[in-house]
A protein has these predicted regions:
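Substrate-binding/gating loop at the entrance of the active-site cleft, primarily
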Residues: 1-15
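Short, solvent-exposed loop/turn segments at secondary-structure junctions
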Residues: 2-4, 55-58, 94-96, 127-129, ...
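A short acidic (Asp/Glu
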Residues: 7-11, 60-66, 94, 98-108, ...
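Short beta-strand->loop structural element characteristic of the AMP-binding/adenylate-forming
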Residues: 16-26
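Active-site phosphate-binding strand-loop segment of PLP-dependent enzymes
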Residues: 24-100
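Alpha-helix termini
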Residues: 38-45, 73-86, 111-116, 144-149, ...
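Conserved core segment of the aminotransferase class I/II
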Residues: 113-197
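Conserved PLP-binding catalytic core of the aspartate aminotransferase-like
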Residues: 189-220
Length: 220
């Protein structure tokens, strides 16, 4: 289960996607499959980009637990200790529809003080978080224990962004700036988004209850 466009993006860059079985037999995050896939790839190559779409994974809605993240980080730190370079991309496009905003971000504390050869990346989507889907806008945020790595990331990102799409959507940039600077507008935005989040959760709860009643298998 994954967003199919990852394939298209990788193909354009001359890379390929390798998947792992997301859920185990009891519909929990499949630690064994994840580790086995990472181990197999890093036997053949010196670096690896890992993409994890969480919280509120597309298309399943699944969110990794704190224990799931501990397993993921134990796995990548093991390979980092062997000299491998790991890029861990966390696609948080739907984070603001995954739960209480502080709780859904708590896992980010786990990425402090990682080895220098682990670069953590967060892919953020304003289009989703700001209920602005028709205006495509987002951000790529990097976290590293090395200032040199962050400086290099900044320079490469500026070059790649300019070469790929020049400048991003001006209307979206303007809206984001105004909302962040206006406390009244920001409060109104949060209220609107929270109402939509509650609606999504209510619909999801109804579906899961009725699926259980009629014996329809459903993903967690």
């Amino acid at each position: 289960w994954f967003w199919g466009t990852y394939n298209v993006i990788c193909q354009e860059l001359g890379s390929s996607v390798t998947n792992f079985q997301l859920f185990d037999e009891v519909n929990h995050f499949n630690h064994t499959a994840f580790s086995a896939s990472v181990d197999a790839l890093l036997k053949k190559q010196e670096s690896l980009l890992i993409i994890l779409n969480t919280p509120a994974h597309n298309p399943t809605g699944y969110s990794l637990s704190s224990e799931d993240w501990d397993h993921v980080l134990d796995c990548v730190k093991k390979h980092a200790a062997a000299g491998k370079k790991i890029h861990l991309l966390v696609d948080i496009a739907y984070i603001d529809f995954a739960g209480e905003k502080h709780e859904t971000r708590a896992f980010m504390q786990k990425f402090s003080n990682l080895p220098e050869n682990i670069l953590t990346l967060f892919a953020f989507s304003m289009s989703k978080a700001y209920t602005f889907y028709g205006q495509r806008c987002g951000a790529l945020i990097a976290l590293s224990s090395s200032k040199a790595v962050i400086d290099e990331f900044g320079e490469i990102s500026k070059y790649a962004a300019r070469a790929t799409w020049s400048n991003i959507n001006r209307g979206a940039m303007t809206l984001l700036t105004r909302i962040q600077q206006d406390k009244t507008a920001y409060a109104s935005y949060e209220a609107e988004r929270d109402a939509l989040y509650r609606l999504v959760q209510e619909r999801g709860d109804i579906f899961m209850q009725e699926a259980a009643q009629c014996g329809l298998p459903a993903l967690p």
